[in-house]
């Protein structure tokens, strides 16, 4: 079989282009995610927002219940998980799990991040830090919070937000505890629930939807339209904070004010 020079050159160009694309993909920043569940995939929200810009790698902690006892059972796994992410080549670390990082207060969240940075030498943020950064970025002071949590975890969130400089004017949770249950909440149910919580608030200037397991990306913009205030939610804005940690600002219009601004 004889291959023409033109075909040979075309094949070589195609192989070369493919190799360049593969090399480019491998040189994109790698954001390491520490996730509460044991088997946590790369979040679809991350792929939808930033797949062309960065890569993701995930280590799960094996959290079973969203309760203080559940969080206590995995808290010592966080630094080893961060070290595993460093071994994989992570450029920075994003500690997911809003309640996992706020349940002992703002100072403990800061300590967790300090421990990760000291152990790995990498930049790090957490989901709780991300929602605080998001609320501050939109100028929030009086916050309504719709959550996945039970009353005890809500009480701790209230304390954390107060320590972070916000006044909580309304808060209500879905009462969920099993780690997989937030993902079963439909977006229609969650949007209505969140809007109802906001309506209970007295002059809230922002709405927080708290829990990384809730699927919130597609409801942020509709909620902002309905409530006429900025909406911050756990997973999308943790990914937003992770991008900023990497020194990147990628605009993602259609998903609310913060993501649209990058």
Describe the predicted segments one by one:
Residues 23-80, 152-154, 158-186:
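N-terminal glycine-rich anion-binding loop in soluble enzyme alpha/beta folds
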């Amino acid at each position: 079989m004889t291959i023409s020079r033109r075909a040979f050159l075309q094949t070589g160009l195609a192989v070369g282009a493919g190799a360049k694309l593969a090399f480019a993909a491998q040189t994109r920043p790698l954001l390491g995610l520490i996730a509460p569940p044991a088997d946590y995939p790369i979040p679809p929200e991350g792929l939808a927002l930033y797949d062309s810009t960065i890569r993701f790698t995930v280590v799960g902690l094996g959290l079973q219940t969203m309760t203080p006892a559940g969080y206590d059972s995995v808290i010592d796994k966080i630094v080893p998980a961060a070290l595993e992410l460093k071994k994989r080549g992570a450029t920075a670390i994003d500690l997911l799990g809003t309640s996992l990082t706020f349940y002992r207060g703002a100072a403990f969240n800061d300590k967790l991040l300090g421990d990760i940075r000291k152990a790995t030498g990498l930049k790090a943020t957490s989901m709780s830090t991300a929602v605080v950064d998001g609320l501050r970025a939109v100028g929030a002071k009086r916050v309504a919070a719709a959550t996945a949590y039970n009353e005890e975890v809500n009480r701790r969130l209230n304390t954390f937000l107060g320590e972070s400089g916000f006044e909580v004017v309304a808060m209500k949770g879905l009462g969920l505890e099993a780690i997989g249950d937030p993902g079963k909440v439909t977006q229609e149910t969650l949007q209505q629930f969140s809007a109802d919580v906001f309506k209970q608030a007295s002059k809230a200037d922002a709405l927080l939807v708290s829990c990384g397991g809730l699927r919130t990306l597609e409801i942020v913009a509709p909620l902002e339209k309905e409530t006429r205030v900025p909406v911050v939610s756990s997973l999308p804005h943790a990914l937003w904070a992770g991008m900023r940690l990497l020194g990147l600002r990628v605009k993602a219009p259609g998903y609310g004010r913060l993501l649209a601004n990058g």
